[in-house]
Amino acid sequence: ATSTQDPNERVIFQRMEEQTNVHIDWTCFVADQFADKKNLALAQFGNLPDGLFNAGMNDYDLLRYAKQGIIIPLENLIDKYMPNLQKVFEQYPEYRTMCTAPDGHIYSFPWIEQLGAGKEAIQAIGNIPYINKKWLDYLKLGVPSTVDELKETLIAFRDHAAELEEEFGIEGGVIPMSFIINNGDQDPSILINGFGEGYGDTGDHFAVTDQGEVIYTTVQEGYKEGIQWLHQLVEENLVDPEAFTQEWSTYVAKGKNHRYGLCFTWDISNIDNYQDYVMLPALAGPEGLVNITRQNNSETSGFDRGRCVLTTSCRNTALAAAWIDQMYAPLQSPQNNWGTYGEEDSFNIFEMGTNKGGEPMLRHMDLGDQSPVEVREAQSVNGPLAILNEYYDVYVTQPDDAKWRLDNMHEVYLKDMNSKYVYPNVFMSIEDTNKISQYDTD
């Protein structure tokens, strides 16, 4: 597949220009430079870009740049020029509410991806632990079901490293367990759900009791006990020494060399392969408690509030809004999110077919042994979009890897999702986001 960084060389945007007769002059920043480049671009008040397509803005950014007069309110543009996004808001009013700032304005166009709902949403768990079944079988071990059994299994991986390396041709050495700390889907927090009260931890450290009380996970006794247990694993050389510092590329490289006994990620095929790993079930804690704390915001599926913004330098806001609205068209959003079809000399994500009614429908191609993340990044453009549950088998088929993940999630974890509530996607004020930042630092 193509891997150009120039958006105008992406087939998706080339087709969009043909359809709309709108040419975009893009400035493209590579991912590891984006935050700094974005801040510099938005500091040039007299020479701002018209907008940011993949803005990557959190609540604090949106409110700060709005207060400074750098980004503009969008609600009137949405109501006048964006029928596709309006339809999404009408079908799911909670998304409009979630996009609305405390001052009543909407400052950004969102990214929305649904697959399943409630406890059965694919986003209910992000950081799935995958354990190496091939190693378990070779060592004649079962899949662990308690924290004590997991520790013994990791010890077995460590103590039989030489045998495993010889048997499976592992280069670089066996790593019993690896992760990327505080990195969303790559974080190991799911392992400590069985400690204490059973809240474990979430990416933003909020949880909701069955009585509807919002709590902060890191001050709970169960969290402290779980962290002490993880510390024991580190002390016994069961954890990758780079787990607290490594970046995604390093994490993946070691996985592709088949070095992991246990790792954490959204989809194991991005790290290693489906054949060698199984999902590690919810582990019973020291007192026998078994629980899966669902990912916050997952009741409303995948949602990124600050995906796309317009600035005060945008002179034709109506045209910009109408063009962005095309990203929310039901046949366009899946392509922006995953990739496209019909690109010559490329690994295409889709082929264009038809649904049962004979209307156009995007059909996912078989990815084979390819990493879903890598092949999709070569064609997709991301940005603002919406993929709703109602679109599947009407405008687009479900991705095979997502269906595999969802089916296995339901089989392994659904029965242990005991909590009634998750913390919703709240648009906080600047004052509240500052407080949360202080708590995280402390």
At which residue positions do the language-model features occur?
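Helix-loop-helix "hinge/cap" segment bordering the ligand-binding cleft or interdomain interface
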Residues: E75-D79, P102-Q186, V208-K254, R307-D345
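Long, His/Glu/Asp-enriched segments that create or flank divalent metal/ion-associated functional microenvironments
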Residues: Q14-R15, T265-I268, A322, L406-H410, ...
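Polar, glycine-rich mid-to-C-terminal structural blocks
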Residues: V278-R376
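Extracytoplasmic/periplasmic substrate-binding proteins
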Residues: T2-N8, F13, L115-Y130, D137-V143, ...
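Carboxylate/His-rich catalytic cores and anion/metal-binding grooves
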Residues: G69-C99, L154-R158, F168-A207, K254, ...
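Conserved N-terminal structural module of periplasmic/extracytoplasmic solute-binding proteins
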Residues: A1-E149, P188, G200-F206, V214-Y216, ...
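Conserved small-residue motifs centered on glycine
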Residues: Q332-D442
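General small-molecule cofactor/ligand-binding pocket signal
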Residues: H23-F29, E242, V278-L280
